[in-house]
Swiss-Prot record:
The modification N5-methylglutamine is found at Q237. InterPro entries: PCRF, Pep_chain_release_fac_I, Pep_chain_release_fac_I_sf, Prokaryotic/Mito_RF, RF-1. This is Peptide chain release factor 1. HAMAP family: Rel_fac_1 (MF_00093). It comes from Coxiella burnetii (strain CbuG_Q212). The lineage of its organism: Bacteria, Pseudomonadati, Pseudomonadota, Gammaproteobacteria, Legionellales. GO terms for molecular function: translation release factor activity, codon specific. Signal peptide: none annotated.
Length: 361
């Protein structure tokens, strides 16, 4: 392991010990915000420090085994050689673990998300495909134990959705779905096609982490136009007789959000404001990402919605993720919600890129 990484690990170990002392300090205990902040940092450092302690113990064991190799007794030398072989393998494993633990964590990984799917080119077929994508994500969410609540939806004339926005709630939602932002293309014979010709349609998917109260953007109420309307059957589970659905327009940016999922106007307004916050923050982050893209090109793509990230070819039963040149002939399984074979390689590709950067420091 590089000396710079060892020094970094020593610094983190010192910080871990320092926080341990602070958490028992009465001044810190009485300051709830500081105590919570330090407790979170302590929990994040703990697995790194514990792994580094194992690494240090293993290093000492290697030194002892190397000393034993100098013994005159051939049996002792043989034992030392066998032990050294095992310890060297363990050292490599611990080094890999430490490098992974040192990779910076995405602060949004544990957040819930807003999933937005819009039908693009392809007319009715694109709307039908948007419906297929929504069902794919809903089934994937079900396998993960997540909940999916539709916030707003506009149905297509022949089924599916022109646009659908849903809130996905659960553990580690963003960490798994963040790779889904972008343009998804489908190649198949539409139900409405009488000549049996293959058509190409597209949808855009946007994954927006739900804004934490700490991260919220300040919005001037004077810059909002709020309209109420009667909820339609498509948008939520409950069809209302009152004007409980909410549409909010952010005048400076033109961003429009709707919510008609809840029974009460108050709850719909709160959910719509949360979605607006997430959209504005996502736009701000996208702007920052574009500025950083010139300095650092990501292997998994920027997540820009104009970027074609995946093709679903039904005649060939093929799914291709263009960012990492991944091709799977498991279309039926993927479209039924088995997304792990697609998402797993994307996560590993990102980790490999981050590890390469870490090793090159």
């Amino acid at each position: 392991m590089k000396p710079s990484l060892i020094e970094k690990l020593k610094t983190l170990t010192y910080r871990y010990s320092e926080i341990g002392g602070l958490l028992s300090d009465s001044t810190v205990i009485n300051d709830q915000d500081r105590y919570r902040e330090l407790g979170k940092e302590y929990a994040q450092l703990e697995p790194i420090v514990k792994c580094f302690q194992q690494f240090q113990q293993n290093e000492k064991a290697i030194e002892s085994a190397e000393e034993m190799q100098q013994e005159k007794d051939p049996e002792l030398r043989k034992l030392a050689e066998e032990e050294l072989e095992q310890l060297t393998l363990k050292k490599e494993e611990l080094e890999d673990q430490l490098k992974l633990l040192l990779v910076p964590k995405d602060p949004n990984d544990e957040l819930n998300v807003f999933l937005e799917i819009r039908a693009g080119t392809g007319g009715n077929e694109a709307a039908i495909f948007a419906g297929d994508l929504f069902r794919m994500y809903a089934r994937y969410a079900e396998t993960k134990g997540w909940r999916v609540n539709i916030v707003s939806a506009h149905e297509g004339e022949h089924g599916g959705f022109k646009e659908v926005i849903a809130r996905v709630i659960g553990e580690g939602v963003y960490s798994q779905l963040k790779f889904e932002s972008g343009a998804h293309r489908v190649q198949r014979v539409p139900v409405t096609e009488s000549q049996g010709r293959i058509h190409t349609s597209a949808c855009t998917v946007a994954i927006m982490p739900e804004v934490d109260e700490i991260d919220q953007i300040k919005i001037n109420p004077a810059e909002l136009r709020i309209d109420t309307f009667r909820a339609s059957g498509a948008g939520g589970q409950h069809v209302n007789r009152t004007d409980s659905a909410i549409r909010i327009t952010h005048l400076p940016t033109g961003v429009v959000v709707e919510c008609q999922d809840e029974r009460s106007q108050h709850k719909n307004k709160a959910r719509a404001m949360s979605l607006l916050q997430s959209k504005l923050l996502a736009a701000e982050r996208a702007k920052q990402d574009q500025e950083q893209a010139a300095k650092r090109k990501s292997l998994v793509g920027s997540g820009d919605r104009s970027e074609r990230i995946r093709t679903y070819n039904f005649p060939q039963g093929r799914v291709t993720d263009h960012r990492i040149n991944l091709t799977l002939y498991q279309l039926d399984e993927v479209i039924e919600g088995d997304l792990d074979p697609v998402i797993g390689p994307l996560i590993r590709e990102l980790q490999a890129e981050q590890l390469a950067e870490l090793s090159g420091e």
